[in-house]
């Protein structure tokens, strides 16, 4: 193998391992800055949302699940420090991951879980793990934890959902909204 093939092989291996949610050591640290990467996750979230839209049986949860509020006040968001944005995204991603895992457990405990629904929930779990790794490589976790207490973001706004469709809608909205806004700004800032 030539020396020029090694970086290409590492990149190919990194892209193959991303869907597994495994931390990829050889991955370029700014992989999430490639809009195609984030778009792939957004398309997966939209697909899951679309599959569950017409779902009546097996899509209701036996309990409410807490999720992050995905509404964005663009005026406020643009005035926020990138560290405050990182806190909001990091906390939202953590809560969303917990919610999807809880939804996965509730679906597994239902009388007859649909294989299609289970597949989309499993993909969402894997995607959120991968996104967490990509954000960590971008420095979001460091940004979020380096803020002094006095300047930290307001407590994360939340609400509850009771169906898989609503959970996937929040998942899709979070990726298209706050996550896309944050990564866009963090990537631009890193390019300067």
UniProtKB/Swiss-Prot annotation:
Q: Which cysteines link up through disulfide bonds?
A: 33-187, 55-59
The GO biological-process annotations, alphabetized, read as: erythrocyte differentiation; erythrocyte maturation; erythropoietin-mediated signaling pathway; positive regulation of cell population proliferation; positive regulation of Ras protein signal transduction
Where does this one sit in the cell? Secreted
Q: What is the name listed in the Swiss-Prot or TrEMBL entry for this protein? A: Erythropoietin
Give expression by tissue. Produced by kidney or liver of adult mammals and by liver of fetal or neonatal mammals.
- Give the signal peptide as a residue range, or say none if absent: 1-26
Task: Give the UniProt family note.
Answer: Belongs to the EPO/TPO family.
User: What is the species listed in this Swiss-Prot or TrEMBL entry?
Assistant: Felis catus (Cat)
- One term under GO cellular component: extracellular space
Give the record's keywords alphabetically: Disulfide bond, Erythrocyte maturation, Glycoprotein, Hormone, Secreted, Signal
Q: Which gene encodes it?
A: EPO
Sugar-modified residues: 50, 64, 109
Q: Which domain of life is it from?
A: Eukaryota
Stored InterPro entries: 4_helix_cytokine-like_core, EPO/TPO_CS, EPO_TPO, Erythroptn
**Stated role:** Hormone involved in the regulation of erythrocyte proliferation and differentiation and the maintenance of a physiological level of circulating erythrocyte mass. Binds to EPOR leading to EPOR dimerization and JAK2 activation thereby activating specific downstream effectors, including STAT1 and STAT3.
Q: Extract the Pfam families matched here.
A: EPO_TPO
Annotated GO molecular function terms are: cytokine activity; erythropoietin receptor binding; hormone activity; protein kinase activator activity
